[in-house]
Structures are given as structure tokens and as C-alpha cells.
Design a protein with these regions (language model features):
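Glycine-rich beta-strand-to-loop/alpha-helix junction loops that act as flexible
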Residues: 147, 179-184, 200-204
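A short, flexible beta-alpha/helix-coil linker loop
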Residues: 32, 150-153
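A short, polar/charged loop-to-alpha-helix boundary motif
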Residues: 108-111, 153-154
Length: 229
């Protein structure tokens, strides 16, 4: 690809709140550390076939060229399945490869700036741990919130804990979809019942599994029993 040339964006217009909400049931966040040498694209394809409805590329150890290659591979997998694909934190990479959007944390680029760079059609998700952060993100134009960590997790050992009561308060305070993250697995999914979340975000419960397709199918079944619809 010629230097400075961007990929074609995913071929669709603005995602509505309901489009995004309906795609939040099982939100997969990648981490190759769990794959034991398996291909990330193959594992994501299996996960989508099993029931994953949204994919975030989060590979902090990857350099730019490797991350761009992974992003293009996952974009193709997700586009074929009609599943939204966003990139963690790296707004420039999301613009370069034509991802559906980006997910930013409280210490990352501001939501408004990410929107300015990626355009009005992009999905911009924001992490939040409190009602104040959630309301500020919604006011800034966030399309959805990732709230957690709900349980201790080896994926992000330094993550701020969010209680189930706080999760319920956040869901009740905003009108945009909320996905709960942090130690969510098939055994704990029932704890999300009544919280108001649109789904659960999962890392190791999918990518550490021997069979990503079967793990995703089980997670999707359990989450479908409890999420707000």
C-alpha cells in the first residue's frame, strides 16, 4: 500500500444507537497472549461464528506495522459477518485501516477529538468507572460505554473495580448502551441480570478457550438470558 494511503472505510453509514445496542451482546476484546500460537484472525472468525457480536482489537505489544496487519485481517473477518470492528485507543490506526471506530479510555484521546478525526459515521466507545464519567462521555458524543472492571482479571490487573451497584447506577443514568467488562464469563454472566447492560465484554473466556467457537456460543447463550433488551 502506498505511503499515506488509507484503506476504504467499512461500507455503511452512521450506526444508530439501536444498531450498536443490538451488537453489544457479546463483545470480544482480543489478546494474543492467550492464543498459544494460534492465528488471531482464525480465532476471531471462530468466535464470530459462535456468537460474538462486536470485536475490539487490543494488542498493546504490537508495533504499528503488525497492528495494521492484524487490523486489516480482523476488519475483513468482521465485515464479512456484519459485526462492528473497533480498535483500542489508536485513532490514527483506525482511520488508516478504515475500522468501524475506536474505543478510548479516560486517559486516551478525548471522545470529541476521536470523532473529529474519524468522522460522524464512526463508532466511538469510551471507558467509564463512575456515573460522572459516564455522563461526561455521553455528553461528548460517545456511542457506547465500557464499564468495569466488574471482577479481578489478569488481563488488566491494575483496572479500577466497579461494583454491581455502580454499574446499575451508570446504566440508569445514560441512554447509550453499556457493556460490562472484567472477569465476565459463562459462570458469572448471571450477575449482570437487572443491571441494564446491553452485553458483556470478554477477553480470556473466549481467547484462552481451546475452542473459541464453542466458548462464544456458551457465553452468548448465558448473556442472552440476562441482558437488557
Amino acid at each position: 500500500m502506498a505511503a499515506g494511503k488509507k484503506d476504504v472505510p467499512c461500507a455503511r453509514g452512521r450506526w444508530s444507537v439501536e444498531d450498536i445496542r443490538s451488537s453489544m451482546l457479546l463483545y470480544a476484546v482480543t489478546d494474543r497472549a492467550w492464543l498459544r500460537g494460534r492465528s488471531l484472525a482464525d480465532c476471531v472468525r471462530e468466535a464470530v461464528e459462535g456468537g460474538v457480536t462486536f470485536v475490539q482489537l487490543r494488542e498493546k505489544s504490537a508495533g504499528h506495522d503488525e497492528a495494521a496487519l492484524l487490523a486489516r485481517e480482523l476488519k475483513a473477518v468482521c465485515a464479512e459477518a456484519g459485526v462492528p470492528f473497533v480498535i483500542d485507543d489508536d485513532v490514527a490506526l483506525a482511520a488508516e485501516v478504515g475500522a468501524d471506530g475506536v474505543h478510548v479510555g479516560q486517559s486516551d484521546m478525548a471522545c470529541e477529538e476521536a470523532r473529529r478525526i474519524l468522522g460522524e459515521d464512526a463508532i466511538v466507545g469510551v471507558s467509564a468507572q463512575t456515573v460522572d464519567e459516564a455522563l461526561a462521555a455521553q455528553a461528548a458524543g460517545a456511542d457506547y460505554l465500557g464499564v468495569g472492571a466488574l471482577h479481578p482479571t489478569p488481563t488488566k490487573p491494575d483496572a479500577v473495580d466497579v461494583t454491581m451497584d455502580e454499574l446499575r447506577r451508570i446504566c440508569g443514568a445514560v441512554s447509550i448502551p453499556v457493556v460490562g467488562i472484567g472477569g465476565v464469563d459463562a459462570a458469572s454472566a448471571h450477575e449482570l441480570a437487572g443491571s441494564g447492560v446491553a452485553g458483556g465484554a470478554v477477553v480470556s473466556a473466549i481467547f484462552a478457550a481451546d475452542d473459541c467457537r464453542l466458548a462464544s456460543a456458551e457465553l452468548a447463550r448465558e448473556l442472552a438470558k440476562v441482558v437488557a433488551r
